[in-house]
Amino acid sequence: MEQCLGQLKEKVKLNEIKSISFSGHMHGATCIDKDHKVIRPCILWNDTRSRQECNDIMNDKSVMDIAGNIAMPGFTAPKVLWLKNNEFENFELIHKVLLPKDYLRFYLTGEFFSDLSDASGTYWLDIEKRNWSNKLLEASFMNISQMPNICEGTDQTGVIKKDIAEKYDLNINCKVFGGAGDLSLIHISEPTRPLD
């Protein structure tokens, strides 16, 4: 955070920023405990250690209808199931699972939110209902209380906490919005070009 805001401070007055939003790599499992401390380093999107856990989740073929996809090692749910199978002492401590950008949001606001684009890459989202699926959560021995709230990318999810505003000289009224996963934003930010 210090590096990012330090670079931004060279271009703008931080206390004049009125709103912040995020993008970040999708699928990462940032697990925090009841004291809101990170339990272990985030398992990143490109980590493939959870292949067996994908097979375990896919034993019930109906999960594909809910998630709209097959379970892949890059997704969050298989990573967390891997924790249960291989680092049970860490798995037992999980209070919330946040995606990387959503951990930054929590740090700045104290609020637990994830936008729909990032939530869709967890393998816990019912894509039709646009909400967490109890069935998908149960497949990795999780429950809805361990999930952040779901929001649209354009929804306001909080304001900067007072201690954070003071620490970084940010506007105490600075609004924080949902944002989106990196792949989703690539699709909407890439200029369209005529076909040759």
Functional labels for PLM-detected ranges:
Residues 1-41, 65, 93, 165-166, ...:
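N-terminal glycine/serine-rich phosphate-binding loop of ATP-dependent small-molecule kinases
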Residues 187-196:
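Single conserved hydrophobic/aromatic residue that forms the stacking wall/gate
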Residues 22, 64-181:
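Gly/Ser/Thr-rich active-site cleft segment
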Residues 33-35, 108-111, 193:
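Short acidic-glycine loop/turn motifs at beta-strand connectors
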Residues 52-56, 189:
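Pocket-flanking alpha-helical
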Residues 47:
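Carbohydrate-associated surface elements
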